[in-house]
């Protein structure tokens, strides 16, 4: 009798967990809500008052695309935010971001508090398989606390996590979705695929395609292949 009860509880718990996962992971359901990245910036910006924004700066070209993206949507993203969390993994990226913020703040009043978080790189280009696995595990462990702090600050506020970069974005998304599933702390994750991806997604893009709440491509030719994606033209 006791064994039967235990099995019933286990089956019930697993069923509830699977239902919860299906409700949280976007690939299992279709959202009819308007996406945050749209040409109607004024309308969307009004719906995102007191926004808590989290962006991650990948290195090199990823950082350049992210800076152009937030400049293009600065009214909706920066000027609507009360807190901006900036994740980065190299010093050059954060210097470029601070310079861009300074340029924007000269002509606009930014009331947001900016908080910087240094993440380890998930992997270095050219590293071996063993080295990559070790680096990914280390980054995942260290990212757990950082993402929880960011997630906690989003509680009670409209929030947006904007990603466009390397493998670290996968780790960030993993933790944010895990907290959503088990701690009931939702977050809106938007991934913008690189402009360089004209025919197929990057490896990060393929991993995040089923996980991101909104997946944005910058070439219309990708839409028939990835029907869940959204296209707003060239954003960067």
Swiss-Prot record:
Give the GO terms filed under biological process for this record.
dolichol-linked oligosaccharide biosynthetic process
Q: Which Pfam families match?
A: Alg14
The stretches that face the Lumenal side, renumbered to this chain, are 1-7
Q: What InterPro entries does the annotation carry?
A: Oligosacch_biosynth_Alg14
- The keyword Endoplasmic reticulum is annotated on this UniProt entry: yes
Cytoplasmic compartment ranges equal 29-236
GO molecular function terms noted in the UniProt entry: N-acetylglucosaminyldiphosphodolichol N-acetylglucosaminyltransferase activity
Its transmembrane ranges are: 8-28
User: Which membrane topology describes this protein?
Assistant: Single-pass membrane protein
Q: Gene3D superfamilies of this UniProt entry?
A: Glycogen Phosphorylase B
Where does the source fall among the domains of life?
Eukaryota
Give the record's keywords alphabetically.
Endoplasmic reticulum, Membrane, Nucleus, Transmembrane, Transmembrane helix
Location(s), subcellular: Endoplasmic reticulum membrane; Nucleus membrane
Q: Name one GO cellular component term.
A: nuclear membrane
**Family label:** Belongs to the ALG14 family.
Subunit comment for this entry? Heterodimer with ALG13 to form a functional enzyme.
* Function of the molecule: Involved in protein N-glycosylation. Essential for the second step of the dolichol-linked oligosaccharide pathway. Anchors the catalytic subunit ALG13 to the ER.
Protein name, UniProt field: UDP-N-acetylglucosamine transferase subunit ALG14
Species in which this protein is naturally found: Kluyveromyces lactis (strain ATCC 8585 / CBS 2359 / DSM 70799 / NBRC 1267 / NRRL Y-1140 / WM37) (Yeast)
